[in-house]
């Protein structure tokens, strides 16, 4: 087990995997393709979708949005606790990413179905802009807005089922089980707080369109220059291998 963990966390091994992935991409003459997994009733997807168009403008990539449905049950040991925490977390952090999150509870299934139907019909090039509008309407409980969008973006129930099924299969094939994540050449970047790591990787590969190297997604907060306390504290660090 220790040997496996050392291999997993080895920076040398990490770089080797990246080098092989890039060599394979070049040999196959493939563009820089970034997959984005979007789940309409995932609170974190409401955050990530606000950065799609900015990301596409900043990097020379082939961007492929993929609509996904329910998570793999095997990945959720405490489903209720997980969903409750996701909602609470996004309510707390949305403003720090300059995103308005209107949700106070999870949307009704009827609205979720309409949101999926609309996005099933959306052209990939306009997915970012339409998905933002859909997400705001969904989490606001704005049925009228979703019905208005349905006039322009129509999908049959079977088309939605097939789209979500295909999206789930692609997602599962990437060893991932949720929404709100970006996937590039064997690596997953889950949520807005990890998007900068994908940006760093693409910048190293020369895929950025400008030379300013300013991140697309930046947390809107500033820590104090110095921290003072009247007494010492014990800090426990729990690293996540996610």
Segments the model singles out, each with a brief description of its role:
Residues 32-34, 177-178:
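Short loop/turn microsegments at loop-to-beta-strand junctions
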Residues 2-14, 48-56, 129-227, 233-236:
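C-terminal cap of thioredoxin/glutaredoxin-like
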Residues 29-30, 228-230:
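A generic fold-level signal
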Residues 33-36, 233-237:
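Short, well-ordered beta-strand elements
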Residues 37-39, 187, 238:
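Short strand-loop junctions, especially beta-strand C-caps/beta-turns
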Residues 20-26, 54, 58-64, 220-224:
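Short, composition-biased local secondary-structure segments
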Residues 40, 46-138, 234-236, 242:
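Structural alpha/beta surface segment adjacent to cysteine/selenocysteine redox centers
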Residues 5-31:
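Non-catalytic pre-domain segments flanking phosphatase-related domains
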């Amino acid at each position: 087990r220790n040997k496996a963990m050392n291999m997993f966390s080895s920076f040398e091994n990490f770089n080797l995997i990246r080098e092989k992935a890039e060599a394979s991409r070049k040999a196959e003459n493939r563009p820089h393709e970034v997959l984005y997994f979007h789940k309409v009733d995932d609170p974190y997807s409401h955050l990530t979708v606000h950065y799609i168009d900015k990301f596409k403008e900043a990097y020379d990539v082939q961007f492929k949005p993929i609509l996904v449905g329910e998570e793999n049950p095997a990945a959720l040991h405490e489903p209720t606790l997980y969903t409750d925490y996701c909602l609470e977390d996004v309510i707390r952090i949305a403003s720090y990413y300059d995103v308005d999150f209107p949700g106070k509870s999870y949307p009704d299934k009827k609205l979720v179905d309409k949101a999926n139907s609309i996005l099933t019909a959306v052209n990939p090039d306009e997915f970012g802009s339409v998905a933002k509008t859909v997400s705001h309407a969904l989490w606001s409980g704005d049925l009228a807005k979703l019905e208005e969008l349905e006039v322009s973006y129509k999908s049959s129930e079977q088309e939605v089922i097939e789209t979500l099924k295909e999206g789930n299969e692609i997602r599962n094939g990437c060893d991932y089980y949720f929404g709100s994540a970006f996937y590039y050449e064997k690596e997953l970047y889950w949520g807005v707080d990890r998007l900068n790591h994908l940006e760093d990787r693409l910048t190293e590969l020369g895929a950025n369109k400008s030379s300013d190297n300013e991140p697309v997604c930046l947390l809107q907060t500033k820590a104090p220059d110095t921290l003072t306390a009247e007494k010492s504290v014990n800090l426990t660090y729990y690293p996540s291998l996610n």
